[in-house]
Curated annotation (Swiss-Prot):
Regulation: Reversibly gated by a two-step sulfenylation-persulfidation process in cells undergoing diverse stresses.
Motif annotated as NPA 1, chain positions: 92-94
UniProt GO molecular function: ammonium channel activity; methylammonium channel activity; urea channel activity; water channel activity
Positions on the Extracellular side per record topology: 58-84, 129-156, 205-228
Membrane topology: Multi-pass membrane protein
Modified residues (Cysteine sulfenic acid (-SOH)): 53
GO biological process terms on file: ammonium import across plasma membrane; ammonium transmembrane transport; B cell differentiation; cellular detoxification; hydrogen peroxide transmembrane transport; methylammonium transmembrane transport; methylammonium transport; regulation of cholesterol biosynthetic process
Full protein name: Aquaporin-8
Species of the source: Notomys alexis (Spinifex hopping mouse)
Length: 261
């Protein structure tokens, strides 16, 4: 496995981009280093959030959380398997933060990735509104996270968002970035973690785990109640996982302390 490129990391020093000969030297295409990954993050985020929003808007009350859980998890796994080798397949600001902390993404690309993911979320949520019957759209609050209605629910919802996002980000970083544990089933395990998270915590916080997934529908539906939970929780979780891997559970290359040499 050590010879494989980590799917959810992007090391610019190892990018196998198109090389063009100029003045006797080879240079790596700047487009494939900087622009193409951001385009893919925008595209993947738009597709993922479109499917996720539509699964909530069209969800039958009889199915409970099953339809959104399967749609979100399967869509994310499929999109990562399809596009992950170009951008790393993050499609989530919390994931990008963690991958940056553990050295899988250049710091200079973190903000462009976030911008791409957020705009992708806006596009996906807007497309979901366009294709959805108006009554169903508004009945579902446009797939915005409206489950937290009272101040008393905030602590539980924030705690659940942090814990659920930790599981998701661990699946990404350990399955697709950390060389010692990465493997070909990473897209499956990442998608499966989303399914499990939504089934477990959807009734408490909505199981967002992704600020871009929260922001797009909030803008389109104009629903901002307790919106900050879905930024603070996932980003704290991403930072925590990044530090956990950097300090304790990462491989020799990633870990900053307790090295053998």
């Amino acid at each position: 496995m050590s010879g494989e490129t980590p799917m959810c990391s992007i090391d610019l020093s190892e990018v196998k981009a198109k090389e063009t000969r100029m003045a006797g030297r080879f240079r790596v295409s700047w487009y494939e280093q900087y622009i193409q990954p951001c385009v893919v993050e925008l595209l993947g985020s738009a597709l993922f959030i479109f499917i996720g929003c539509l699964s909530v808007i069209e969800n039958s009350p009889d199915t409970g959380l099953l339809q959104p859980a399967l749609a979100h998890g399967l869509a994310l796994g499929l999109i990562i398997a399809t596009l992950g080798n170009i951008s790393g397949g993050h499609f989530n600001p919390a994931v990008s933060l963690a991958v940056t902390v553990i050295g899988g993404l250049k710091t200079m690309l973190l903000i462009p990735y976030w911008i791409s993911q957020i705009f992708g979320g806006l596009i996906g949520a807007a497309l979901a509104k366009v294709v959805s019957p108006e009554e169903r759209f508004w009945n579902a609050s446009g797939a915005a996270f409206a489950i937290v209605q009272e101040q008393e629910q905030v602590t539980e919802a924030l705690g659940v968002e942090i814990i659920l996002t930790i599981l998701l980000v661990l699946a990404v970083c350990m399955g697709a970035v950390n060389e010692k544990t990465m493997g070909p089933l990473a897209p499956f395990s990442i998608g499966f973690s989303v399914i499990v998270d939504i089934l477990a915590g959807g009734g408490i916080s909505g199981a967002c785990m992704n600020p871009a997934r929260a922001f797009g529908p909030a803008v389109v539906a104009g629903y901002w109640d307790f919106h900050w939970i879905y930024w603070l929780g996932p980003l704290l979780a991403g930072l925590f996982v990044g530090l956990l891997i950097r300090l304790f559970i990462g491989d020799e290359k990633t870990r900053l302390i307790l090295k053998s040499r």
